[in-house]
Amino acid sequence: MEDLTPTNTSLDTTTTNNDTTSDREAAPTTLNLTPTASESENSLSPVTAEDLIAKSIKEGCPKRTSNDFMFLQSMGEGAYSQVFRCREVATDAMFAVKVLQKSYLNRHQKMDAIIREKNILTYLSQECGGHPFVTQLYTHFHDQARIYFVIGLVENGDLGESLCHFGSFDMLTSKFFASEILTGLQFLHDNKIVHRDMKPDNVLIQKDGHILITDFGSAQAFGGLQLSQEGFTDANQASSRSSDSGSPPPTRFYSDEEVPEENTARRTTFVGTALYVSPEMLADGDVGPQTDIWGLGCILFQCLAGQPPFRAVNQYHLLKRIQELDFSFPEGFPEEASEIIAKILVRDPSTRITSQELMAHKFFENVDWVNIANIKPPVLHAYIPATFGEPEYYSNIGPVEPGLDDRALFRLMNLGNDASASQPSTFRPSNVEHRGDPFVSEIAPRANSEAEKNRAARAQKLEEQRVKNPFHIFTNNSLILKQGYLEKKRGLFARRRMFLLTEGPHLLYIDVPNLVLKGEVPWTPCMQVELKNSGTFFIHTPNRVYYLFDLEKKADEWCKAINDVRKRYSVTIEKTFNSAMRDGTFGSIYGKKKSRKEMMREQKALRRKQEKEEKKALKAEQVSKKLSMQMDKKSP
C-alpha cells in the first residue's frame, strides 16, 4: 500500500536563529520573487490575470465598465456583496469581481467602509507594489447602482473550507499555513495596515497551494498613515496613475502630531468574527498589528486541534471566555506549538509576541523567509492526529482538493467538461421504492405471494422498530439497517454519537443526551469508505472527511454495511445526481453545507410561519364560532 505520509520538504532549506528574547527582533525580510525556470518557459503563454495585475501595479488601474466583463457564475455572497467568476472580454483573462449594491450600502451606512476598503486595496497594490500572499486589485469602477472590485481569481476555496473538509492538519502543513499568513501580515503591518478580521475564511488557497489574505472590509490604517479619501465619483473610474491622467498618485504621509510614535494603534469598535476576535477589540481599545497576530494564533490552534481555542454555547459566553482568556490545549496538542500559541494568546497586546519575534522563534526555525513564495506547498491529506491512545493516521486514498468543481467531477466520475461547478454537501434523496439491503430480504420476487410476504415482513420489522427503538423518530419511517455508537473525531476532539444506517439511503448521527439530529453523512457517487484498523475508519465525501472510531472494534462491519447499502442504492444515487445536473438543481442538493447561523435563521422563519398559520387557523375558528352563534340565535 502506498505511503502518502507527507515528507518534510516544504518549509526547510534555511535555518534562522532561534533566539527569541523580547528585546531582539528579526531582520526585515525581503521576498525573492524571481521567476523559476518553469515560469520563464511559459512567458509566451496567453495573457493571464496575474500578468494584467502586474501591469496595473506598474501603470495604474485600467478604466473599465461592467460591459468589459462576461459574468459567468456566482461564487458566493456576503451580507451586502456578491462575488462572480468573470472573463475580461478583451483579454480572455479570468477574474473575480466583487459587486456591491449602492442602495444597501447607503441604507445601512456602509459606504464609508467600502470607500476605505477600496482605498486600502488600491494603496496596497498601486503604491506598495502588492504581495504574493495578499489580494491584489486589478481595477475598480462603479455605475449608478453598483460598485465593482476586480481582483485575482482563486478557485481552490479557503482555509476554512479545507479545515471543514479535513478536520485538522499535521504539524508540517499547519506550520506552512502559519508561516505564509505571518509573511502576508508582515507586509500589511510594514505598510501600516491592520486587517482586523483574520480568520480561516479570509485565507484563500491558490491553485499552486500558496495562501492569499483577502477581505479588507474591516481593515484600517494605523501609525499615522493617511490614505486617499476619494469616493466613488465619475472621475475616479480611471486610475489616477493611468497613462491618460496627469495627476499624481494619492499622497500618503505619517503625522507625528496626530499619532505619537509610541502609540501607533487606534481606537476601534468591535468588528470581525467572534471566534477569532481579540480582547482589545472587545474592550473597544487600541487596535494595531497585535490584533492580527491574535487571529493568527487562533488559526494555528485550529489547524492543529480541529477547533478554535475559544468555543461556547452562545456568543455572550464566547466573548466572556475570550476576555477571561479561558482556553486550554487538548490532549495530544504538540508541545512546540502550545509554547508559541501561549505567547500569542495574551490578553494585553503590548506583551503579546510580535511578528518579528515570531519569525525568529524556534517554531519557525526551518522556514526560508526569503524564498517562502517559491517553496513547494505540502499536499493536503485526510489526517487524524494521535490521541485517545490511538496513533496518527494518514489516508491511503490519493490526495484530493476539497470542493466539487468541474475538475473534481471529471476526476471522480468521468462526467466530461460540461459538468456544472458547485459546492458539495449532504445528499438527501427522498425515500423511493426500496431496492433491497443486506439486512432485509427484499429481492425482486417471482410471485405475488413472495412480494406480499416481503412487504409484510418489512412492515412487521418497521412496527417493532417504531415501538421499541427510541431513535425511530429520526428515521422518517425508514427501516434502520445498522446502528451503534461511534466516536466522531475532528482533530484532537471527539464526540460520541449514535449512528443510524437506514433505507433511503441515509446515514444519520444523533446527539443522544439531547435527542438532537446533528447531521447526515452525504451519499454521493464518489463516496469512499476507508478502513484504517479494527476501530478506525474514514468516510470520504465531497464536503468533508468523516473520521470515525468504533469502541467495539467492529469498524470492518460498518465499512461493509455502508458499502453494501451504497452499492444497492447506486442507481438511485446516480439517478438523483444526473437529474440534478440536468435540471440545474445540483447546488440545492449538493450545495454548500449550511452554517449554524443559517439553520437557526431558517428555524426561526419556520416557527414564524407556523405561528402565523396557527393564528390564521385560530381566527378562522373564532369566525366560524361567531357565525355559528349568530345562526343559532336566528333559528327558532
From Swiss-Prot:
Q: What is this protein called?
A: 3-phosphoinositide-dependent protein kinase 1
Any single biological process term in GO: regulation of synaptic assembly at neuromuscular junction
Subcellular localization(s) per the UniProt record: Cytoplasm
Q: What are the GO cellular component annotations?
A: axon; cytoplasm; neuronal cell body; nucleus
Q: InterPro entries this protein is in?
A: Kinase-like_dom_sf, PDK1-typ_PH, PDPK1, PH-like_dom_sf, PH_domain, Prot_kinase_dom, Ser/Thr_kinase_AS, Ser_Thr_kinase_AGC
| Gene assigned in the entry | pdk-1
In short, the EC number is 2.7.11.1
Q: Where is this region: Disordered?
A: 1-45, 233-264, 593-636
Q: Which residues form the Protein kinase domain?
A: 69-364
The scientific name of the source species is: Caenorhabditis elegans
The record ties this protein, via PANTHER family, to: 3-PHOSPHOINOSITIDE-DEPENDENT PROTEIN KINASE 1 (PTHR24356:SF406), SERINE/THREONINE-PROTEIN KINASE (PTHR24356)
Pfam families, sorted: PH_3, Pkinase
Named from the GO MF annotations, one term is: protein serine/threonine kinase activity
Q: Which PROSITE patterns match?
A: PROTEIN_KINASE_DOM (PS50011), PROTEIN_KINASE_ST (PS00108)
Coiled coil where? 550-631
